[in-house]
UniProtKB/Swiss-Prot annotation:
Region (G4): 477-480
Keywords: Cytoplasm, GTP-binding, Initiation factor, Nucleotide-binding, Protein biosynthesis
Provenance organism: Legionella pneumophila subsp. pneumophila (strain Philadelphia 1 / ATCC 33152 / DSM 7513)
CC per GO annotation: cytosol
Region feature G3, mapped onto this chain: 423-426
Gene: infB
Protein's name according to its UniProt entry: Translation initiation factor IF-2
InterPro entries per UniProt: DNA-bd_dom_put_sf, EF-G-like_DII, EFTu-like_2, IF2_assoc_dom_bac, IF2_II, IF2_N, P-loop_NTPase, Small_GTP-bd
Role: One of the essential components for the initiation of protein synthesis. Protects formylmethionyl-tRNA from spontaneous hydrolysis and promotes its binding to the 30S ribosomal subunits. Also involved in the hydrolysis of GTP during the formation of the 70S ribosomal complex.
Family, per entry: Belongs to the TRAFAC class translation factor GTPase superfamily. Classic translation factor GTPase family. IF-2 subfamily.
Keyword Electron transport: no
Length: 868
């Protein structure tokens, strides 16, 4: 606090200006005007002066005060009120108050405990006017505590009482002065402590000595003191707490012994301490609960101030099972919080991600960039052949089976401009790869074969392009074939809301032939025209930012990621963060296989130097240093693990019943290795979709790279099928597989994997049986046989009745028995079967209650061929 005037200081302290001036002068400071400035040193001098005067006032106060009181009363002594005699009794009371500082303290300073006190036997002379004998009854001696200081005798003179009265008046005046000074000191200490802290040694808190208050509230203070509620300033020695009427009967009187120990006082004090002053809320308390992406049940209950058992009950009522330490996801947490009547607040723990965005240097130089074009369409409609013609290479011949199974990223320089092409797979298994291609592109070229028309993958490609809000250019391929019908293609595409410009729409249609090269130049012109309309621009300086198109594990080079740079410039030696992985860029390889030092916007390059294989579709950014990259990567890995665990543990009651029955279902374990990450995801997804309620496909391990010894060990331990897609096993893995009789299946086309796994699952299906009724016989009469029992004489009214087949006995179309046909005879001969229209005798095994009119239904069980 800065220097203030005397007037301002008086207002802060809360006393009149004249009084503050007097106190300043008493402290030795020359102040006469209220506009004079008081600095910090003068405030300290005034504070020390007031503390000293307070201490003197306290020391001047008497250390012990004795209070005496007399009271007169009349008591009737006798058998009744009329014949009894009245006795005048004088009762004297004496109470002594001793200052606490005069008694040695035995407890801690912070919370002093009342020292034990002993009351010496005191004799009171009582004048009794009656005819009763003048004997003084004996009073029992009270020894409540060990002796500390004897109490003065009560046979003192009236002068001492007057002296006490004068002491009381003096104490009252001193108390008023002390109280006033104390208030001033407290206010002044607050002012001084704003800038200069006062040490504990300098702090002196004067005790308030007020005799009048003690004398007025004696009874309440003593009762509170006994209960342990209050520690009085003075020790009270009370000789006659309860009025004891003493008659002069001779002898000496002693006080009654008061039973009460120090231990019981402590218990009373503890009970008083444990009682709280809070009232039970009458209205429900609605709390704002912060919910992160994952949270345990115990932590969620703590944030709602309820027990974890209550949260578990609510989750069970909602159909979800959980334990107190289980991690639940954000969606489940929000439902639980709302169900319990609180307000959920969703928070995103992305402080690290936000810091990453701030740390990335952003460029300012903007230039035009080449368009990124994705070629989409159905299988074998000529996507890669078109790109092959444009690049003048043989890409299609290099793909297994002639179909594309990777995302190919190529940068093509044409006489009219540069274009970056992304070639996506066309078959259904690569939906995720195709979706990633649409998200990273500017223009989509939809290839449709003129002789085949619109197919399911064609429709799916249209949906991806519309979802990404990317313009479409339709290329009608295979126009060199004689059965080409472009009008049919246009009609089918118009159904999918792709209207050609010739029909008044906004989609360009180009007729081409990837084999002969017809219309290729027109297609390139359409692409460049569309890019000019889009006005594609990107920042060329600053940190690079892009997307991972594909990734793989290359033998000798390690993890390799194909990155399409979208903004900035990627240099060799930069620290690149891609999803969960990071690393220093050791080399940049162009799509032609050349080593380059940098890559600008719309340029695809292969990056070497990452710590592991990133996921296709992950965002790749250049960060300032490796420390920041490691921090963000570890944060993402931890968050991904928590979210995955929460989703895995989200078990419903229905799921528990499924798991109970799932033990009976058969599982086909698979260890899968592929050459690139995108193919691995597509194969794993396609195989998982083959699962049914009876048989399941479990990809227990999947990875990018060759088959190693650890993969073979895992397949042996889990009894799994080992599949390699465009990869081979090393020598150690081959030898181990031969020793353990583990077969390794190699594939280069995804359809072959799906077909073989589907066949294996079909063989694992449990056989299904169907009952077929082969014949029905009507009972006409019943005969008794001593060997078999009841024999039913029947007429075969439908089909054929065969011996040893299972049968059912029907009475009024109700099945009353199911068993086996034991005996079948025609006349007296045993026969194997009886056809429709013939009579026969039928003996039912272990059943004799056959009556005329019953129907005997003969059936057999037939196995049905199962299929997925």
């Amino acid at each position: 606090m800065a220097d203030v005037t005397v007037k301002q200081l008086a207002q802060v302290v809360g006393i009149p200006v004249e009084r503050l001036l007097n106190q300043l002068q008493e402290a030795g400071l020359s102040f006469t005007d209220d506009q004079q400035t008081v600095n910090e040193e003068q405030k300290r001098i005034l504070l020390n002066h007031l503390k000293g005067s307070s201490n003197r006032d306290i020391s001047a106060a008497p250390e012990r005060i004795t209070l005496r009181r007399k009271s007169m009363s009349q008591v009737t002594v006798g058998h009744d009120m009329h014949s009894g005699k009245t006795v005048n009794i004088e009762v004297r009371k004496k109470k002594t108050f001793i200052k606490r500082s005069a008694i040695p303290e035995q407890a801690e300073v912070e919370e002093p405990v009342v020292p034990p006190v002993v009351e010496e036997p005191v004799h009171e002379e009582i004048t009794v006017v009656s005819e009763v004998s003048a004997e003084t009854p004996e009073l029992k001696e009270t020894e409540e505590h060990p002796v500390i200081e004897p109490v003065a005798e009560l046979d003192e003179t009236v002068k001492e009482e007057e002296k006490i009265n004068s002491e009381e008046n003096t104490a009252e005046s001193q108390d008023e002065l002390t109280h006033a000074n104390t208030d001033v000191i407290e206010n002044l200490v607050d002012v001084v402590e704003e800038t200069i802290p006062v040490s504990k040694k300098e702090e002196v808190k004067p005790e308030k000595v007020s005799k009048k208050k003690h004398l007025e509230q004696t009874d309440s203070d003593i009762s509170e003191f006994k209960k342990g509620k209050k520690k009085p300033k003075y020790h009270t020695f009370e000789h006659d707490e309860e009025e004891q009427e003493l008659h002069r009967r001779g002898g000496r009187s002693k006080f009654k012994k008061k039973k009460g120990t120090e231990k019981s006082d402590k218990y009373r004090e503890a009970e008083e301490t444990l009682t709280h002053g809070f009232a039970l809320p009458t209205a429900p308390i609605v709390r704002e609960v912060l919910i992160p992406e994952t949270i345990t049940v115990a932590e969620l209950a703590k944030r709602m101030s309820v027990k974890a058992a209550e949260v578990i009950k609510v989750m069970m009522s909602l159909g979800a099972m959980a334990t107190i330490n289980q991690v639940i996801d954000q969606e489940t947490s929000v439902i639980v919080v709302e169900e319990m009547g609180h307000k959920p607040i969703i928070i995103k723990e992305d402080a690290v991600e936000t810091g990453l965005g701030e740390a990335i240097s952003k460029g300012t130089k903007t230039e035009g960039r080449a368009p990124v074009v994705t070629i989409m369409g159905h299988v074998d409609h000529g996507k890669t052949s078109l790109l092959d013609y444009i690049r003048r290479t043989k890409v299609a011949a290099g793909e297994a089976g002639g179909i594309t199974q990777h995302i190919g990223a190529y940068h093509v320089s044409t006489p009219k401009g540069n274009i970056t092409f992304l070639d996506t797979p066309g078959h259904a298994a690569f939906t995720a790869m195709r979706a990633r291609g649409a998200q990273a592109t500017d223009i989509v070229i939809l290839i449709v074969a003129a002789d085949d028309g619109v197919k399911p993958q064609t429709i799916e490609a249209i949906q991806h392009a519309k979802a990404a809000k990317v313009p479409i250019i339709v290329a009608i391929n295979k126009m060199d074939k004689p059965d080409a019908d472009p009008e049919r293609v246009m009609n089918e595409l118009s159904v999918q809301e792709v209207i050609p410009e010739a029909w008044g729409g906004d989609t360009m249609f180009v007729n081409i032939s990837a084999k002969s090269g017809m219309g290729i130049d027109d297609l390139l012109d359409a692409i460049l025209l569309q890019s000019e309309v889009l006005e594609l621009k990107a920042v060329t300086d600053g940190a690079a930012k892009g997307v991972v198109i594909e990734s793989r594990l290359d033998k000798g080079r390690g993890p390799v990621a194909t990155v399409l740079v979208q903004s900035g410039t990627l240099h060799k030696g930069d620290i690149l963060l891609a999803g969960f992985q990071y690393g220093r860029v050791r080399a940049l390889v162009s799509d032609n296989g050349d080593l380059v030092d940098s890559a600008g916007p719309s340029i695809p390059v292969e990056v070497l130097g990452l710590s592991a294989i990133p996921h296709a579709g992950d965002e790749a950014v250049v960060v300032p240093d490796e420390k920041k990259a490691r921090e963000v990567a570890l944060f993402r890995q931890g968050r991904f693990r928590d979210v995955k665990l929460a989703r895995r543990q989200k078990t419903t009651i229905e799921g528990i019943m499924e798991n109970m029955t799932a033990t009976e279902s058969k599982v086909l374990n698979i260890v899968l290795k592929a050459d690139v990450q995108g193919s691995l995801e597509a194969i794993s997804d396609a195989l998982t979709k083959l699962s049914t309620d009876e048989v399941k496909v479990d990809v227990i391990s999947s990875g990018v790279g060759g088959i190693t010894e650890s993969d073979v060990h895992l397949a042996i331990a889990s009894n799994a099928i080992l599949i390699g897609f465009n990869v081979r096993a090393d020598g150690t893995a081959k030898r181990l597989a031969e020793q353990e009789s583990v077969s390794i299946h190699y594939y280069s086309v995804i359809y072959d994997i799906v077909d073989q796994i589907k066949g294996a699952l079909t063989g694992m299906l449990a056989p299904q049986f169907k009952e077929e009724i082969v014949g029905i016989a009507e009972v006409r009469d019943v005969f008794k046989s001593p060997k078999i029992g009841a024999i039913a004489g029947c007429m075969v009214i439908e089909g054929v009745v065969k011996r040893n087949n299972p049968i059912r006995v029907l009475r009024s179309n109700v099945v009353i028995y199911e068993g086996t046909l034991e005996s079948l005879r025609r006349f007296k001969d045993d026969v194997l079967e009886v056809r429709q229209g013939f009579e026969c005798g039928i003996g039912v095994k272990n059943y004799n209650d056959v009556k005329p009119g019953d129907l005997i239904e003969v059936f057999e069980t037939v196995e049905i061929k199962r299929d997925l």
